[in-house]
Amino acid sequence: MNTTETSRAAAPLVLILGLGETGVAAARWCARQGSPLRVADTRAQPGGLAALQAALADATVEYRLGCGEQFPPDLLDGVAQIVLSPGLVPHESPTRELLEQARERNVEVVGEIELFARALAGLAESREYRPRVLAITGTNGKTTVTALTRQLIEAGGMSARAAGNISPAALAALIDALDQDDLPQVWVLELSSFQLETTRTLAPDAAVVLNVTQDHLDWHGDMQAYAQAKARILKPARLAIVNRDDPLTVAMVESLQALNVRSFGRDVPALVGDMGLELGQGVAWLTACESNDFDEPAPAPRRKKDAPPPTRAGGRMSRLMPVDALRIRGVHNALNALAAMQLARSLDLGWGPMLRTLRDYAGEPHRAELVRSIGDVDYINDSKGTNVGATVAALEGLGQQVVLIAGGQGKGQDFSPLVPVVRRHARAVVLIGVDGAAIGKVLEPTGVPCVAAADMREAVRRAAELAQPGDAVLLSPACASFDMFRNYPHRGEVFAAEVQELALDRGEVA
């Protein structure tokens, strides 16, 4: 037996449970550390199988695929650690039974982000590599804030990589950085509630919870568990950033006035370090509350026993940029911009390069994305609006009357929060998918016309008939897409294609 075989035999056996993108990344990382692997999936041909087989020699991996509705009894034999895919629901069969067995056997259960945190700790010891880490979570806006934060940081002169839920997986990005000898100064991590459930040692320099609305209740069980999963990232963070308009995120910090807390919101900021919006002379501005120019830092007084903790002071408001100068549309995206700026500002970067980058940022695909205008009607692709909160934000943020296209797989959500915003902002609603009728039933009290469409082509055509000049036709389904489409990007692509087809039929060429 050679040295490599000896080290693998001595290393603990790791079970990779679920072979999606994060499972492949975790398997590659564990194999890189010399761990023998066992890979299990309920599917016979999981999506990540080809990628893993290409990356690793078969001899290092034992595959247990096609497990179906029950994992085999001997799956945990010899296993020291389970890396759990965020796509597996812990309280549903067959995952629930396997995790119960793992607890009985004292087998550690972690996720890919936890392995990433431990990898950074190891690199700090072996290479003295200590990057800054910024973490972003929330129901809606995570990908936009993550991508924008990375761009703001790079504009400020620091190297950065974005990874996590945004793709690539964090460990895949780390492997690439190591192989390219291109470790960044800053990691910007988009983290889902699923990922946070299995993360324990990640301690970001700054973390933000953007918002919390109903989503993934089929995975977490209830809103309390969902919010608690999101809140996990704030406690270990050196700087906690929350949305002060959202009571659920405010409740995650001890006090909005605390020295290690920052907030953003729709109102004018009052405490140093906070950001917000201000309406002045008919123009909405992105604003920041900053220290008064002549304030000198006072020496920190010795804190008396039982004295209240020190708090942040008020400051002066600085107007940074008109909201209309942003290319990303809607108030919700203005708030996303504020969150990204606060994260970048936590690295002591200046406003100038940030604002120039922010002005040019066009947003991410399928997120309040303008497809085109036809006959003075804007057609907007917000296919990523897979939950009620996202659709509420899109309707409130656009600032124009809307014909809404909504529906799909509702995931057990309560659709009633749509009622007041549809009443205020929607001229009509076109319903699609298996839960379209359920949404229509909930919206009956609004008095807003609701019509059904069999497919996206009919939905776009019906919406075009209902829209008036100056309106927007908004695809923001408030639902998952899998009843009619491969995924939400496919849904958005079909919508965009139908909009372009409509333009051709009307003789309008882009």
Curated annotation (Swiss-Prot):
The lineage of its organism: Bacteria, Pseudomonadati, Pseudomonadota, Betaproteobacteria, Burkholderiales. Keywords: ATP-binding, Cell cycle, Cell division, Cell shape, Cell wall biogenesis/degradation, Cytoplasm, Ligase, Nucleotide-binding, Peptidoglycan synthesis. One of its GO terms (biological process) is regulation of cell shape. ATP binds at G138, T139, N140, G141, K142, T143, T144. It catalyses: UDP-N-acetyl-alpha-D-muramoyl-L-alanine + D-glutamate + ATP = UDP-N-acetyl-alpha-D-muramoyl-L-alanyl-D-glutamate + ADP + phosphate + H(+). Cell wall formation. Catalyzes the addition of glutamate to the nucleotide precursor UDP-N-acetylmuramoyl-L-alanine (UMA). Belongs to the MurCDEF family. One of its GO terms (cellular component) is cytoplasm. The keyword Iron-sulfur does not apply. The gene is murD. GO terms for molecular function: ATP binding; tetrahydrofolylpolyglutamate synthase activity; UDP-N-acetylmuramoylalanine-D-glutamate ligase activity. Residues 294-316 are annotated as: Disordered. It is found in: Cytoplasm. Transmembrane segments: none annotated. Its EC number is 6.3.2.9. The keyword Cell division applies. Pathway: Cell wall biogenesis; peptidoglycan biosynthesis. It comes from the Bacteria. Pfam families: Mur_ligase_C (PF02875), Mur_ligase_M (PF08245), MurD-like_N (PF21799). Disulfide bonds: none annotated. Signal peptide: none annotated. This is UDP-N-acetylmuramoylalanine--D-glutamate ligase.
